[in-house]
């Protein structure tokens, strides 16, 4: 297992869940968190602890977004009219790195962030290298022609894990995706149980 994978799987171990549904996740073999202290019996969490855990899990799923950036997304969701938890999920799923991951151009959110950052993705024919770039309904996202033979792309193209949510249309052969619509929380295929309502409660305390 590479250092990058070890760092990534710390989130799984800390949460005690297989966040991304990956077959190599260490929690498939362990029942405790990272480090020797992870083996101690866990006590019942306070309401704050439950909310914090929900926030850490959702933030971790999207490649462990920085706290500053994640709080900013919450604040934007809170300003908009409607169900704040639904809006939060919609904003997260509109991130370009999230769409690249959902389209299965690469295998993980971490790889998607790096892939976008290195300029391998076009949006409506123009190169975009900002992982947090927000896509709109109807946007076409594709892998640059020169990037289609990269090992990270070939690994994903040969994987059996090619299912994509119905709010993204994907041509896997051409490596082109279309963002059809902003999803509701119930549309998003999380491998682990997510509770965005608790995330809202967490930030509402401050």
Curated annotation (Swiss-Prot):
Domain of life: Bacteria
SMART domains attached to this UniProt entry: Ribosomal_S4, S4
Gene Ontology MF terms: rRNA binding; structural constituent of ribosome
Pfam family, any one: Ribosomal_S4
Record region (Disordered): 1-46
Keyword line: Ribonucleoprotein, Ribosomal protein, RNA-binding, rRNA-binding
Any one GO biological process: ribosomal small subunit biogenesis
Compositionally biased residues, Basic and acidic residues: 1-16
InterPro entries, A to Z: Ribosomal_uS4, Ribosomal_uS4_bac-type, Ribosomal_uS4_CS, Ribosomal_uS4_N, S4_RNA-bd, S4_RNA-bd_sf
Start and end residues of each S4 RNA-binding domain: 94-154
GO cellular component labels: small ribosomal subunit
UniProt family annotation: Belongs to the universal ribosomal protein uS4 family.
Record function comment: One of the primary rRNA binding proteins, it binds directly to 16S rRNA where it nucleates assembly of the body of the 30S subunit.
Oligomer and partners: Part of the 30S ribosomal subunit. Contacts protein S5. The interaction surface between S4 and S5 is involved in control of translational fidelity.
Name of this chain's protein: Small ribosomal subunit protein uS4
Originating organism: Parvibaculum lavamentivorans (strain DS-1 / DSM 13023 / NCIMB 13966)
Gene: rpsD
